[in-house]
Structures are given as structure tokens and as C-alpha cells.
């Protein structure tokens, strides 16, 4: 993504656009400049390596995506960043920052005619190039995959995920609604009620769909005490199974849809947010009336639409679990997950038979220097061949 924010006064805007185009066309990527950036990132990378959520996300994406481009973190790792050479940046620029890949979103004090003229200036003053090929679809899992990262702490961190679907899937809106019901940020979500309100396992739990060009992820995550780890996973898994199998709660569906409609205007409350929405529409080739018709399309989603979508796209028997904790009995965990699939769901344990001592604030300390992001042999500079992540917008 290339972003430019400038004053709308014609002379200043023209100078800014001219400078941007000059940089795009003629950057030389001097080795000394690259080395300076690499040096500046080392401290940040070190801090990230000591962050359990960072470790969990890297392991999660690599476990699910394998050799796919999405497997590698967009911020890189020490291993991949230090291997970047000027030729890599030049190759990326020449292959992807070209007119055939361009999606231009413009917001600000411009008429439509002025915006069209500006877009034409940008698109005709850079290399035309060739449009990037479509990303391949990743291979979905066929069974449970449990990954454990040893980490000394009283708290354990849990991420449960699976491949989901793409941004252009017709089920997109139904799945967004389903996700709000299952693991939205409010206390009315199913996971929050089961894990926090009823059992006190965690301060917060959330789920999300990541809709991308190739299949993105459905994931849920939370942290809990080490002694509550297996029980909390059991409840989270049972909640997911029950959500897929049982009829949709009509009252919760009504409240969720109303909440989405009320919150939607906040997504374009400033020039920057409007620009982001326009860029999203262009990049994913959404209909031009996407924003104006949003509320109407949400209202039309029925319980049957949501039920069909989650039964199609959620697979509680093919989950990848990444757990950052001091100890984990993987055999016991897998047996518990398999048992959940075979027996009728009754969410247990309940508040009546468990201790709900609040979780103390924990200072996390690694068992040893954490080098997890650099351990995987496939750790290479992020794949750029056939990678279509190259939208360009001007604010």
C-alpha cells in the first residue's frame, strides 16, 4: 500500500504527487539505507520475540498455511529481514508497483473531474507492468493440529483457528454476523458468556474472521490460568460445536444485526476511514453501492442464512490449536477434543463446581531467549511471486 496525504491546494498537491511518483519510479534502494532500517528493526524484533501473542500468531499461521505466502508474518522476522537485499526490493517494485495492479482511492477537497485527472496522472506516470496472478488457495486441514510453545508463566495463551473463506464469498456478511454472535467484543457474545461470565476463566475472549484474497482464517483467542487451561479449551470447543449444531438464537441475531447497522457509520467518519473503505471496495472489487446498501443487506440476513454459512465454513473437527504455556498434556487435550465431537454437548464445568478466583496481573518472563520465529527452515523473505497484495491509494 502506498499512501499520500497532502494539502488540497493545487500547487502543493501537484508537488507532493510528483515527488511520490519520482520515488516510485526511481528509488535505488541503497544498501546502506537498507542496513540502517534492518538495524533499527532489531530491537523491535527482539521485543516481539518475547511476546507470547507474537509467538502464537507466527506458529499459528505457519501451521495452517505451510508454504503459502500467508504463512510468513508481514512484519518479517530477524531471519527474513536480515536477508533482504536491494535486488529483492527492486524486483518487488518492478513487478507489483505498476499501473496494471493499481487501485486508487481518493478522498478530500476535489471534484470528481479533478479526482479523475489526478488518478490518470498517477496511472500514466508509472510503469504499466503486468497484473499479478491470483494467489493459490491454501490446503485445509483434515484433523486436529495441536502446537505447544513452552513459556514460563502463570498464564497460558490459547489460539484456536482454521482456514475459512475469501473476501468475495457470498457468505461474507452472514459470517460477519455469526462471528459477532459467537465471539464479538461485547458481554453478550457466546464465548464471553461461557468463558468469563459463567466460569471466570478469562478477562476477555474474542473471535474473528479474516477475509482475504486467498482463504483467510477464523480464529478465537484468550488467556487463562495454567490450572484452568484444559477446562477452558473444553468449554471454548464445546461452545463452537454447539453454535454450529444448534438453531440460531433469534433474539441474539436481531440484536447483533441492529448493533452492526448502528456501528457502521463509524467506519467512514473521517477522510482517512472513508479512503480505507474505498480502497477496500476497489481492491476486492466490491459493488460500488457497497456502503449505501450495507444496512439493507444486513437486515435481509436470516437465521437460516447464518446457520447455513457457519455449517459450511466452520469445522470444529479440523482445528489448529496453538498454546503458549509452561506445561501441556497434548495427548489429554486431543482426547478431550475428540470426545467433544462424539458426545452430545453439555457445557461443563459450570460455575457451581469450580473456583473462580480472579486472575492476578502477571509479569510474563520467558523460560529462555525466545527464538521461535527463526526456527522454521522455511523462514525466508516474504514470498513476492504471485502475491497480489499491492493496492495503492492516495488520501
Report the location of each language-model feature.
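Hydrophobic side chains in well-ordered alpha-helices
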Residues: 16, 115-118, 191, 232, ...
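A common structural junction motif
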Residues: 21-29, 123-130, 238-247, 338-347
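An aromatic/glycine/proline-enriched structural segment found at the starts
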Residues: 66-74, 98-99, 103-166, 268, ...
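Short, conserved secondary-structure transition motifs
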Residues: 41-48, 138-149, 258-267
Amino acid at each position: 500500500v502506498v499512501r499520500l496525504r497532502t494539502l488540497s491546494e493545487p500547487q502543493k498537491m501537484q508537488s507532493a504527487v510528483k515527488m511520490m511518483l519520482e520515488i516510485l519510479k526511481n528509488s535505488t534502494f541503497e544498501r546502506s539505507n537498507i542496513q540502517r532500517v534492518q538495524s533499527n528493526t532489531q530491537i523491535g524484533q527482539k521485543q516481539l520475540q518475547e511476546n507470547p501473542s507474537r509467538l502464537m500468531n507466527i506458529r499459528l499461521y505457519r501451521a495452517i498455511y505451510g508454504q503459502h505466502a500467508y504463512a510468513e508474518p508481514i512484519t518479517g522476522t530477524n531471519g527474513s529481514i536480515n536477508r533482504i537485499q536491494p535486488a529483492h526490493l527492486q524486483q518487488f517494485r518492478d513487478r507489483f508497483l505498476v499501473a496494471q495492479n493499481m487501485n486508487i482511492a481518493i478522498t478530500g477537497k476535489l471534484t470528481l473531474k479533478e479526482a479523475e485527472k489526478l488518478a490518470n496522472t498517477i496511472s500514466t506516470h508509472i510503469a504499466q507492468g503486468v497484473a499479478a496472478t491470483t494467489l493459490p488457495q491454501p490446503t485445509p486441514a483434515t484433523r486436529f493440529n495441536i502446537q505447544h510453545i513452552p513459556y514460563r508463566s502463570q498464564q497460558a495463551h490459547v489460539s484456536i483457528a482454521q482456514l475459512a473463506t475469501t473476501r468475495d464469498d457470498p457468505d461474507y456478511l452472514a459470517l460477519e454476523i455469526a462471528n459477532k454472535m459467537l465471539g464479538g467484543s461485547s458481554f453478550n457474545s457466546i464465548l464471553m458468556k461461557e468463558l468469563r461470565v459463567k466460569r471466570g476463566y478469562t478477562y476477555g475472549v474474542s473471535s474473528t474472521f479474516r477475509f482475504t484474497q486467498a482463504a483467510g482464517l477464523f480464529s478465537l483467542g484468550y488467556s487463562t490460568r495454567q490450572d484452568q487451561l484444559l477446562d477452558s479449551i473444553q468449554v471454548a470447543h464445546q461452545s463452537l460445536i454447539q453454535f454450529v449444531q444448534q438453531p440460531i438464537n433469534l433474539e441474539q441475531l436481531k440484536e447483533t444485526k441492529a448493533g452492526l447497522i448502528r456501528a457502521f457509520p463509524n467506519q467512514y467518519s473521517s477522510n482517512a476511514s472513508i479512503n480505507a473503505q474505498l480502497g477496500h471496495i476497489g481492491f476486492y472489487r466490491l459493488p460500488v453501492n457497497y456502503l449505501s446498501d450495507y444496512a439493507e443487506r444486513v437486515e435481509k440476513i436470516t437465521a437460516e442464512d447464518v446457520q447455513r454459512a457457519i455449517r459450511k465454513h466452520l469445522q470444529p473437527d479440523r482445528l489448529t490449536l496453538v498454546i503458549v504455556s509452561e506445561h501441556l498434556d497434548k495427548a489429554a487435550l486431543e482426547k478431550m477434543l475428540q470426545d467433544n465431537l462424539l458426545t452430545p454437548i453439555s457445557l461443563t464445568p459450570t460455575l457451581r463446581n469450580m473456583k473462580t478466583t480472579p486472575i492476578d496481573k502477571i509479569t510474563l518472563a520467558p523460560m529462555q531467549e525466545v527464538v521461535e520465529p527463526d526456527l522454521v527452515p522455511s523462514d525466508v523473505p516474504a514470498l513476492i511471486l504471485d502475491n497480489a497484495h499491492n493496492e495503492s491509494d492516495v488520501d
